[in-house]
Regions:
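Primary mode marks residue(s) on the alpha4-beta5-alpha5 output face of response regulator receiver
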Residues: 1-291
Length: 291
């Protein structure tokens, strides 16, 4: 390969892979660059920190089980995945929490059990048509995630009386739970959590989760503070933090500020509530709004 432009931010963007029938350019961080080099060389790899890669144009792969396959096995077809993010975790990904077969509209593990195991995370939100005939509150909550997640998730609704408990609008079957827009924030911020992230947030302990956890906020969100998880509003002289469509990702041990910024306006994946028990990274999947 040749260098078309020298970069300054530590990320590397790679053109479409000509051997595949689809369009699959990608942009990868430093950990994923090491992963990519090891994969290309067929070399051993130790994933010693989280990694993030973008494939927002989609992609196609020859196999979900063999990292070295150059074409699909006899009788099989190329695997096509729409716009997605790829994630690395030092502990890998638990097949009890994520599918190990390709999915168009929910996260799945690629190359499970190999040194190159990673999570494929589709980021196309459910369409209005796919939601079906549901209430406005259900529609808002379901807008947080892709169809494969939200159609089978537990959907929570706001309390019917002031000070009451949230109500269940839909009983789920896939372990995910989706919450409605927070009335206390000025933005629209429904979210869908997998079992790991939901338990981590509920316990106030996202840095000590037993394995990698994931949340969707594809409708975007707004937060009081990027440093204080207990803030009840923005600090004096500051404004609400608005983040467009994004993922939230947590891993055991949290994230190192040497590799991820804490600047919520950077446009890069950034650490929210760094150094606290609720630390996680926010991964924008569209351009950040400019102030």
């Amino acid at each position: 390969m040749i260098v078309l432009r020298e970069g300054t931010n530590g990320w590397t963007c790679i053109t479409d892979w000509p051997a595949s029938p689809g369009n699959d350019p990608m942009c990868i961080d430093d950990m994923f660059a090491k992963w990519n080099d090891a994969l290309g060389a067929g070399a051993p790899l130790t994933v010693d920190r989280p990694g993030v890669a973008y494939m927002l144009a989609g992609g196609s792969d020859a196999s979900n089980t063999d990292p070295f396959a150059m074409a699909p096995a006899a009788g099989e077809e190329w695997i096509s995945t729409p716009a997605h993010v790829m994630l690395l975790s030092p502990g890998g990904f638990d097949a009890a929490n994520f599918a190990a077969t390709p999915k168009q509209d929910e996260p799945y593990i690629m190359w499970d059990g190999t040194p190159y195991e990673h999570l494929m995370v589709p980021v196309v939100p459910i369409s209005q048509e796919a939601m079906g005939d549901v209430s406005a509150e259900m529609q808002n909550t379901m807008s947080a995630g892709p169809a494969g997640i939200v159609k089978n998730a537990t959907i929570m609704g706001n309390p019917t009386v002031e000070g009451g408990e949230m109500v269940v609008l839909q009983e789920g079957t896939n372990g995910w739970i989706c919450y409605p827009d927070r009335a206390v924030s000025p933005g629209n911020d429904p979210q869908c959590n997998d079992t790991i992230s939901d338990a981590g947030f509920a316990a106030g302990a996202t840095r000590t989760v037993p394995s990698a956890g994931l949340s969707y906020m594809l409708a975007g969100g707004s937060d009081e503070s990027n440093t204080d998880p207990m803030a009840s509003g923005p600090a004096a002289g500051e404004e609400w933090i608005s983040t467009p469509s994004h993922l939230m990702f947590m891993v055991p041990g949290g994230f190192d500020t040497k590799f991820f910024t804490t600047d919520h306006m950077s446009g890069y994946p950034y650490i929210m509530w760094a150094g606290t028990d609720l630390e996680h990274i926010m991964i924008p999947v569209v351009d950040m709004p400019m102030e």
